[in-house]
Amino acid sequence: MGKKNPNARHTDAATPLTTDDSNSSSVSRRESATESKSASESESSPPRSNTKQSRTHKNVKASGKATVSSSSDSDQAVANSSANDEEKEPVCKIRIVPLEKLLASPKTKERPSRGSQQKNVTINDSSDEEPLKGSKLVLPARKSRNKNASIIELSDSEEVDEEEESLLVAIPLPKEAQQTKPEKNSSKASKESIEKRQKAQKEATTSSARAIRSVNGTRRGSLSSERSSRASSSRAESPPRPKRCVVRLKRVSLPKTKPAQKPKKMSSDSEEAATTSKKSRQRRSKSESEADSDYEAPAAEEEEEEERKSSGDEEEAANSSDSEVMPQRKRRRKKSESDKGSSDFEPEEKQKKKGRKRIKKTSSGESDGDGDDDKQKNKRKHIRKIIKTKDLDLTTKEAAKEEDDRRKRIEDRQKLYNRIFVKSESVEINELVLDFDEESKKALLQVDKGLLKKLKPHQVAGVKFMWDACFETLKESQEKPGSGCILAHCMGLGKTLQVVTLSHTLLVNTRRTGVDRVLIISPLSTVNNWAREFTSWMKFANRNDIEVYDISRYKDKPTRIFKLNEWFNEGGVCILGYDMYRILANEKAKGLRKKQREQLMQALVDPGPDLVVCDEGHLLKNEKTSISKAVTRMRTKRRIVLTGTPLQNNLREYYCMIQFVKPNLLGTYKEYMNRFVNPITNGQYTDSTERDLRLMKHRSHILHKLLEGCIQRRDYSVLAPYLPPKHEYVVYTTLSELQQKLYGYYMTTHREQSGGDVVGKGARLFQDFQDLRRIWTHPMNLRVNSDNVIAKRLLSNDDSDMEGFICDETDEDEAASNSSDSCETFKSDASMSGLAASSGKVKKRKTRNGNAGGGDSDSDLEMLGGLGGGSSVQKDDPSEWWKPFVEERELNNVHHSPKLLILLRLLQQCEAIGDKLLVFSQSLQSLDVIEHFLSLVDSNTKNYEFEGDVGDFKGCWTSGKDYFRLDGSCSVEQREAMCKQFNNITNLRARLFLISTRAGGLGINLVAANRVVIFDVSWNPSHDTQSIFRVYRFGQIKPCYIYRLIAMGTMEQKVYERQVAKQATAKRVIDEQQISRHYNQTDLMELYSYELKPSTEREMPILPKDRLFAEILTEHEKLIFKYHEHDSLLEQEEHENLTEEERKSAWAEYEAEKTRTVQASQYMSYDRNAFGNQVMGQFGNASGSVTSNKIFGFRSDILLQLLNMKISKDHQELNQNQVIQLVPTYLQQLYNEMNNGDPTMYKDLLNLHSNIVHPSGMYMNPLLYANQNPNAAGYNQGTGGVPPMAGGSVAHGPPAAPAPGFEPDKVYEID
């Protein structure tokens, strides 16, 4: 076959290829094309590059013998039958084969090579022949094109359109042409005819090239005529031959189709047939669409194909047709985000659905999406390459550059500030300058010295940090909108005072700073605390003319709007709750006039405040919540976020909060995931490689450095110099026999009967945890739950009764309406006869999701069963599965719960020494049970008749006097009143506070207590950490003791070990709503495993530093299996464990310590009778047990109090804050004097000690004599001491006899 000139361009008009009976008819139609049309096409078509043409030819040549004839055996059979059967009608068929299939290795056996005479062969044997060049598929003009028809035309032009795609088309010719097919040993005449035909084709090619270069219409017409005549003569002389061509298809978008109307309801058989037919049509259309458009397979698909072949599926793949292969590839390609090959052939409706699917697919930066399989949860992933800095979004680079420039300016300014104002020899901070003149070196803005005296060093640094981050300088604040920061100081470090100081400085100097309005947004429980803190700290400032607006005091919206408008016009500080701000800042709020809405938008949004402070800012961690959206709409960029919850490992919270205070600093979410989250997360798996670990550390360091300019962290180690020590004990309690029986039945039988399934049931996990918690608390908890289920059934259809229910997290409007009598509902009138439900009364309480009943605050998954029609309980009630195992009289037996026994014993010991106790629980039902048994103890003390057994526990427990309860049902005013009454150190009767962890774990100050019981484990360990800081904060003067009670061998122990023991709670924030997605099948099976009876024997415990806890360990050996001291606020260090002999020796020393007489020079007891009368010269015996560490014979908390008194006496001009700062200095002086043998200060402390009337925690609580036997404390008196009279008054008790041989004026050697 003659080769054509690649540069030549044919100008013949292309006509449609039809199925006529001869090839000559097709040729004649092509010759009859108008010359003018061909001339215009040749003239208008510009020269094109031959790159794609050459690439196409190269691909075809590279295919070798893998041509169209090897596509499938079925096509060869059709072609052979068409060539050999002379009697059949002529046929012209087009076979379209994807290019990757042609380039692949042939699936049939290779045929033996043939001679040179086999060049002209049939279509079935033409695999060795080079394909015909120059054929092009041309589409008619758009005007003449039928939109609903698919037209294919054949052209001899070699031009390549950039938008078109090439396919090889095999065309079997009619029988007239195939009858002239040359065979082996052909005659000489046939060879001559072939040579003539080739010569004619060569001449036609030459004439075509001349026609393309011609610009004259006449010459072009003559050349076209000459070419046509020569081509006709050559075709007449040469016989027709089989022919192959390259067809190029162009994508044509289909017209929009109207959605089909909903068909009528059909029978099941017809519906199934219609569905099958529809699916087959969809598969067929997908196959055709894929074959017409997508001819290049991705590399991943080629690899999958090769793997499939190598695994033994080669024969199946060879016999499969295109329609069987393409739909599978179509489904895979749907998931590809970058591939859009078949989008033009899809209807618009399908394209939209396809787009919605792609949204769910994680992008390049979200490879660790939550939708992965459980198998991939704990395994490393192949993350994408980290985006380079130059490829980041423009806003990201601009924000990073702006932050870098700001930090450089602050560093330079700080160096100059240190040279001017900071004196290295100065110990106390005399002034805090926020801005100064660089030339004159004069202070332009400084903090009021009255407030400065109240600040600790870390608070001074915090105020300076907030100013630098938000304002930088006075000049910058006037020219730029400013930015924000996060003050991530630990709980109890005085973030409120820092904000008060900064706000006062800005508002007093409003002409310089330009700040008139400061907005404080906080949780509902801390709104009043903020107003109180502003009022109390302003007293120490020289200027206190700042107006503070507490909007929560006003209950109606018109008054709130009026006060907000007044604040906006007059200036000052406004305090709002998060929910109230969300309601008032809502543009679409109902019930407001247009003018009122405009006033609210002006005051709160645009222009809004000049500075906004968001307390407990971790509530803004989700940018999709309505509160986050409302706060983000504020125009001001000067935003301060306060949070005491550590953020080191919660990367998503990082992004949401940083995006709020420093927009675009971390880039888009996709960039943030790619640059930080994926590498850091990928290095935390057990199978992470060394490279993953290095990359994780590297990216963590970069993230820390990037954010240190806008986040300031201070942990609780800052408190250590100012607060007494803290000890935290994790106590593992055993289960009673009844609890073990209930637990075993639930795990083996009841769960299966109720449809329990471990695999993938996160909701079921929560429900089981709630039911099991009721078991290990006390069987009475099961009764409380059953009564609550009955209450829900009775009140499910009564909407009127729902108005009396109280929500655990209520809005301000609801809290205001329920503030009068809501808190009184938690104490039932039926305390004598058990719980209220047992006597027909129902406690009305609303759970977090609005359901009725006294359920748990975080338990929304209880099985309610069917609704009951009356008050009688259905026999098949699933909540009463426990009744066959528990008798009614056993419900009031306190010995069925080791946890309750330990709690009551702690209360008894604390009552004896005057310590106050807090009890935190996640469950409102657990608090109900504790209240119930306190009422039984009260009845036992007052000799009332009751059914039950509370042992030897006695005491008066009256709600509102002896103990308080704080949960979501209490209004803000009631919370404040209860906390104030409890914190009164002279009120020794108020000694217990029951608190719901979710409702009272934030924002309250209860430093009057120094002991905390965490009654149950929380899924979120940060809640327990918040509970600890209710007592361990500034203002605490006693050593703090924390007791975590955990049921041994149960799911509670598994949860604690997973969430707390293996991860420091200060560095972990877990979203409890995502727990079901964080547990795979193996994790769930581990949680459901239990060992109620330990396989090992109880070891001798280490002697605790808390002597009160040592008493309980000695008395209740069978209830406490083991314990360990664990500081949840610090990284744990490996310590050497004591041997068994060393532990026994320590306990023997402790027992001997309890029974011997102790000299006052060594120890001072908390018992009042251990201290004599100074007038009589009797310092008395220090008999009794020791409850704390001693320093020179004093308890550490007593010594701190005495040092405070001495400093106040020596320096009467100092305030309390300055006195506390001098305590370490006086303590060091005491050590030095005692080491040198000088007892001057020691004697002064002894004199102060003897003059104290009621030191905190020093004497026996006088209520002990009024309520119960004084010997109930369990302390043995020394030989020289006189025991107090039963029922006698403490103030008039008999003096203790002096210790033998003890002379007060003599200096004794200190142990």
Swiss-Prot record:
GO MF assignments: ATP binding; ATP hydrolysis activity; ATP-dependent chromatin remodeler activity; DNA binding; DNA translocase activity; helicase activity; transcription coregulator activity
Top-level taxon: Eukaryota
Residue span, Helicase ATP-binding domain: 476-664
SUPFAM superfamilies per the UniProt record, alphabetical: P-loop containing nucleoside triphosphate hydrolases
Phenotype reported upon loss of the gene: Deregulates heterochromatin silencing.
Regions of compositional bias (Basic residues) in chain numbering: 241-265, 352-361
Compartment(s): Nucleus; Chromosome
Reactions catalysed, as given in the entry: ATP + H2O = ADP + phosphate + H(+)
InterPro entries the UniProt entry points to: ARIP4-like (IPR044574), Helicase_ATP-bd (IPR014001), Helicase_C-like (IPR001650), P-loop_NTPase (IPR027417), SNF2-like_sf (IPR038718), SNF2/RAD54-like_C (IPR049730), SNF2_N (IPR000330)
Occurrences of domain Helicase C-terminal (ranges): 905-1085
Composition bias, Polar residues: 114-125
DNA damage found in the keyword field: yes
Acidic residues: compositionally biased ranges: 155-166, 290-306
Main location: nucleus
GO CC, one annotated term: nucleus
Biased segments, Basic and acidic residues type: 28-40, 181-202, 336-351
Keywords linked to the UniProt accession: ATP-binding, Chromosome, DNA damage, DNA repair, DNA-binding, Helicase, Hydrolase, Nucleotide-binding, Nucleus, Phosphoprotein
Motif (DEGH box) on chain: 615-618
EC numbers for this chain: 3.6.4.12
Function: Global transcriptional regulator. Modifies gene expression by affecting chromatin.
PANTHER family, per database record: RAD54-LIKE, TRANSCRIPTIONAL REGULATOR ATRX HOMOLOG
Family under the similarity heading: Belongs to the SNF2/RAD54 helicase family.
Protein name per its UniProtKB record: Transcriptional regulator ATRX homolog
Organism: Drosophila melanogaster (Fruit fly)
